Amino acid sequence: MISVLQDWRELGDCIETLQRDKLPLHSTPQKNWDHFILRKALSQLEPGAPIADLGCGHGLTLEFLRRLGFENLLGIDLSISWRLRAREALTMYRERRLKPPYRILRGSISGSSIPASSISLALSISTIEHGVDVDRFLADTFRILEPGARLFITTDYWGEKVKVSDSIRAFGLPWRIFDRDRISRLLDSAARIGFEPSENSIPACSGAPVVWQGLAYTFIALLLRKPPSRSETHLSNGR
């Protein structure tokens, strides 16, 4: 699956759906598209399936997943913000919990301490554009995924190359906008590592609903799958 946010009309439809279903909205309006698309990728997962948020930031996506009913949640980030810890504490207080609603690890998404073949879905929301070594990230995520599990990625995107000044920093990190060529190379790298791209056709951009630092662009979402084990393949084929 490869999806591109096309315009404000599409974004408005996503927000309306999330509101109707009484799900928490992201503080950045455009990021609600990421969560809307992510929700589709979660449709076949059980509530207890282990899910890892790679680059969890302030925990907004972890909270979204929790509100969807998922119980086995793990977040990893280079720095653990006070906002994330405050959200944990508030949830524990409101729900009279003795344990936090999700586990948080400090570390790199390009070489984590997560055990191999232990995750049913890994996701990375607006993270890889901030100086991440994409090949190392893909390789380590492939390692931690169970056979047949998936990786969901969103990132900043525009079909043509957008020059980003080195002086622009986001969260103290470098920033880039992926173009069609970079996404194609990412998909090629994923295939070499062993992922099965669900779709190779990258949709065209019809609008730029995101503007930051004077640059207009959009978002792209990718869903990649680690192949199932040979025994699982035989079972699915009725052998």
Locate predicted features.
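Class I SAM-dependent methyltransferase Rossmann-like catalytic core
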Residues: I2, I15-Q44
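A short glycine-rich, Lys/Arg-flanked "PGG" loop and its adjoining helix->strand segment in the class I
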Residues: D135-R150
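Acidic carboxylate diad motif detector
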Residues: I153-T155, G159
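Conserved Class I S-adenosyl-L-methionine
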Residues: V164-E196
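Conserved class I S-adenosyl-L-methionine
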Residues: G48-G57
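Core SAM-dependent methyltransferase catalytic element
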Residues: I193, S201-R239
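Class I SAM-dependent methyltransferase SAM/SAH-binding core
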Residues: L60-G111
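A conserved beta-strand element that flanks and buttresses the S-adenosyl-L-methionine
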Residues: L123
